[in-house]
């Protein structure tokens, strides 16, 4: 490709958007049409409905054709320019050095048409929470354009030698186990609660009464619903990350996965701001870890829950893969770090007493209105206190900070847990807080801010000694 190029999206972008809008419009018209009719629809009614639906589809088609024909993408003076000359003219210019990721995606329709969606993300704080540019091209053209952009925004020379490439892949069995370990504790407890509540009904089931038969069938359906939900979660994770592969090539990591929606990420290593190791409760019991990376571009889409990097595996395998793919982070699994200290219990107790002082009068008024007596006033606070004590204790055991020479590690969680590894140079800024009780015990909590999508930008720091926080401030400077 030459510099100062200018082109449009592939024309299939029109049909892709028309299909989405038409599907929504048809669904709305159909539901309203059916609910409003008291009798079976006549041929005239059906023709009117079809006419309105076709008119809407044609209107959307014409509008999308106008947008497509008057939208141009070009590269001018080391910048990517997107021009939209429709009713409202808009020109968006992005400096190529500010591009953090160049990613490829394919849904089923795009696979059938042989096209590919190319997504660009910037590494500026103002646009870190959204994908800036979506470009649809033929697959080969998209791959060429991707490599062209990577060449323009590279920070180091890309090594193409096969001896320098480091590859990792996951088998179908490993991806299936990843889906299993992704199940959270809440889902398991909810399922056990449902089964526990309906099992007595099943045991007492008689063979005579219709009402009992109805309750029996309903109970079975409820169990099937919840079990099916968990099975679907495992299946969804399996299908989403099937055919997973990751490759380190030069100064970039290339990540791809999925069969229903094929995703290809290109991640410049110098744009990775943190590495996060996650564990659900099941994963903690099985001593498994999954890896996410914190940067701009990954995990922005609503359907993507994580900035996925490596699936759940044993500690030894994860350590080996991270050493091969991201040796710059020098992640040490054995570092436990400094805990919060017993003074944190005084802070939590003070906060709890304050909330109880607000809650008990409200419960007393509610009990008087509902005529429940003192049961509500006593039982609700006791249950809340027990729940909070369990959460606080698990947090006390889990939350730690380790300050190394070049990076810090934050460990937090309750039943699930995560470890965040951050280089000091990647921290945008810190904020520290200290209440009266915390000041008396010489502890502080805070937040650190990274350049990332909105949900990964802010990370909490647990209560730590003031000396530890001062050391952290010194290292960030």
Where are these regions (language model features)?
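N-terminal basic, Ser/Thr-rich segments that initiate or prime the first beta/alpha elements at protein or domain
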Residues: 1-477
């Amino acid at each position: 490709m030459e510099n100062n190029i200018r082109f449009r999206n592939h024309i299939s972008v029109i049909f892709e958007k028309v299909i989405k809008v038409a599907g929504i419009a048809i669904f709305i018209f159909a539901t309203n049409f059916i609910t409003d009719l008291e009798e079976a629809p006549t041929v005239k009614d059906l023709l009117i409905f079809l006419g309105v639906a076709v008119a809407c589809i044609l209107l959307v088609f014409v509008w999308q054709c106008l947008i497509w024909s008057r939208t141009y993408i070009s590269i001018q003076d080391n910048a990517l320019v997107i021009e939209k000359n429709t009713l409202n003219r808009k020109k968006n210019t992005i400096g190529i050095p500010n591009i953090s990721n160049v990613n490829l995606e394919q849904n089923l329709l795009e696979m059938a048409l042989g096209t590919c969606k190319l997504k660009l993300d910037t590494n500026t704080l103002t646009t870190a929470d959204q994908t800036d540019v979506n470009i649809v091209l033929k697959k080969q053209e998209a791959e060429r354009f991707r490599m062209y952009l990577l060449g323009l925004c590279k920070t180091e020379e890309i090594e193409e030698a096969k001896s320098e490439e480091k590859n990792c892949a996951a088998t179908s069995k490993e991806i299936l186990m990843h889906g299993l370990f992704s199940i959270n504790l809440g889902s398991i407890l909810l399922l056990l609660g449902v089964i526990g509540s309906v099992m007595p009904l099943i045991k007492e089931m008689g063979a005579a009464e219709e009402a009992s038969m109805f309750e029996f069938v309903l109970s079975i359906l409820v169990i099937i619903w919840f079990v099916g939900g968990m099975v679907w979660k495992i299946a969804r994770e399996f299908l989403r990350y099937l055919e997973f592969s990751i490759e380190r090539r030069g100064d970039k990591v290339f990540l791809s996965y999925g069969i229903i929606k094929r995703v290809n990420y290109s991640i410049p290593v110098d744009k990775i701001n943190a590495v996060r190791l996650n564990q659900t409760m099941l994963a903690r019991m099985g001593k498994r870890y999954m890896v996410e990376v914190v940067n701009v571009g990954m995990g922005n889409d609503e359907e993507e829950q994580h900035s996925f990097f490596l699936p759940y595996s044993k500690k030894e395998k994860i350590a080996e893969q991270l050493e091969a793919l991201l040796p710059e982070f020098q992640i040490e699994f054995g570092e436990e770090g400094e805990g919060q200290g017993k003074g944190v219990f005084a802070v939590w107790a003070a906060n709890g007493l304050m909330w109880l002082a607000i809650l008990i009068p409200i419960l007393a008024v509610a009990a008087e209105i509902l005529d429940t007596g003192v049961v509500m006033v006593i039982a609700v606070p006791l249950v809340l206190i027990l729940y909070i004590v369990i959460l606080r204790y698990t947090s006390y055991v889990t939350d730690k900070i380790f300050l190394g020479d070049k990076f810090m590690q934050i460990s937090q969680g309750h039943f699930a847990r995560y470890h965040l590894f951050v280089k000091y140079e990647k921290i945008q800024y810190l904020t520290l807080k200290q209440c009266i009780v915390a000041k008396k015990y010489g502890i502080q909590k805070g937040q650190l801010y990274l350049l990332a999508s909105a949900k990964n930008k802010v990370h909490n720091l647990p209560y730590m000694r003031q000396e530890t926080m001062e050391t952290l401030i010194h290292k960030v400077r």
